[in-house]
Curated annotation (Swiss-Prot):
UniProt family annotation: Belongs to the acetaldehyde dehydrogenase family.
UniProt source species: Cupriavidus metallidurans (strain ATCC 43123 / DSM 2839 / NBRC 102507 / CH34) (Ralstonia metallidurans)
Keywords annotated in UniProt: Aromatic hydrocarbons catabolism, NAD, Oxidoreductase, Plasmid
A GO MF term: NAD binding
Cited InterPro entries: Acetaldehyde_dehydrogenase, Acetylaldehyde_DH_C, NAD(P)-bd_dom_sf, Semialdehyde_DH_NAD-bd
GO biological process: catabolic process
Keyword match NAD: yes
Class of this enzyme: oxidoreductase
EC number(s) given by UniProt: 1.2.1.10
Positions of NAD(+) binding: 11-14, 160-168, 285
HAMAP family linked: Ac_ald_DH_ac
Catalytic activity of the protein: acetaldehyde + NAD(+) + CoA = acetyl-CoA + NADH + H(+)
The protein's name in its UniProt record: Acetaldehyde dehydrogenase 2
Length: 314
């Protein structure tokens, strides 16, 4: 099957790292264009050196490129505010969109949990870095027993948080909280992000807490380990920091949206080290987003290729 041509909109850290991942590891996708708005950006310069067609004229520049007619999938690595226009423009040209912003126009996708559920959707949202790291764990627990409440804390190196991340803090917490419920399966979800200013920068660390009824702790631990292994298939630096912890709550505690609650608290500590393709190893928060986006695009490209093959056969 011929690889699917893709464009990346946004030549910053995430867009550049994603480009390098596609160039090195793309199986069903290949670079067709890199789009930015700053002619002097390092991302566009690097793309040019690597032989990728570029434009510094944004989405309008992409439409004017001779290569645009071959583009089947576009990644948006800009901002939630800009994404609405980008999406509308691309949809008008029948281009599938993979959204790396918190705009959440399309369904949430976490490849290890629901990659196969929305392959026909015109727009797929990759949630957030914190969501990509923690929602699989919530889903693992929920596969064993109902999760009444899940709370995640994503701690990332301040140095790895660019202007887009900082401008989208509110969208980050809102989008991640909703996806904890809709993808992770928790009845209620809450997300917190911490920008850690420590020097030297620390790698991404995540804490996942789930409140459940009494359940088979061995089955939960096995489900968590299986999910970690699945995650490592596309994010090799994803790992469990220590054993899954279980604490019984006999005295009722007030849970947002649920009221006084007792039960079993499951706590999982994670760390995510980046592959250092372009970004430093401590920027696991960015690496997990680009890795998840590539994994998602591979599935979409396969589906597009299969559909094209079936149409040709008929």
């Amino acid at each position: 099957m011929k690889p699917c041509k893709v464009a990346i909109i946004g030549s910053g850290n995430i867009g550049t790292d994603l480009m390098i991942k596609i160039l090195r590891h793309g199986k069903h996708v290949e670079m067709g264009a890199m789009v930015g708005i700053d002619p002097t950006s390092e991302g566009l310069a690097r793309a040019t050196r690597l032989g990728v067609p570029v434009t510094a004229a944004g989405i309008d520049g992409l439409l004017a490129m001779p290569e645009f007619g071959e583009i089947r999938i576009a990644f948006d690595a800009t901002s939630a505010g800009a994404h609405a226009r980008h999406n509308a423009t691309l949809q008008a040209h029948n281009v599938r969109v993979i959204d790396l912003t918190p705009a959440a126009i399309g369904p949430y996708v976490v490849p290890s949990v629901n990659a196969g559920e929305h392959l026909d959707a015109p727009n797929l949202n990759m949630v957030t870095c914190g969501g990509q790291a923690t929602i699989p764990i919530v889903a693992a627990v929920a596969s064993v027993t109902p999760v009444h409440y899940a709370e995640i804390v994503a701690s990332i190196a301040s140095k790895s948080a660019g202007p887009g991340t900082r401008d989208n803090i509110d969208e980050f917490t809102e989008t991640t909280s909703r996806a904890i419920e809709s993808v992770g399966g928790a009845r209620r979800g809450k997300a917190i992000i911490v920008l850690n200013p420590a020097e030297p920068p620390l790698i991404m660390r995540d804490t996942v807490c789930c409140l459940i009824d009494e359940a088979d702790t061995a089955a939960i631990e096995a489900a968590v380990h299986a999910m970690v292994e699945r995650m490592q298939g596309y994010v090799p630096g994803y790992r469990l920091k220590q054993r899954v912890q279980f604490d019984r709550i006999d005295t009722p505690v007030n849970v947002p949206g649920l009221g006084p609650t007792t039960g079993l608290k499951v706590t999982v500590f994670l760390e995510v080290e980046g592959a250092a393709h372009y970004l430093p190893a401590y920027a696991g928060n960015l690496d997990i987003m680009t890795s998840a986006a590539l994994a998602c695009a591979e599935r979409v490209a396969q589906a597009l290729g299969n559909h094209h093959a079936l149409s040709a056969a008929s």
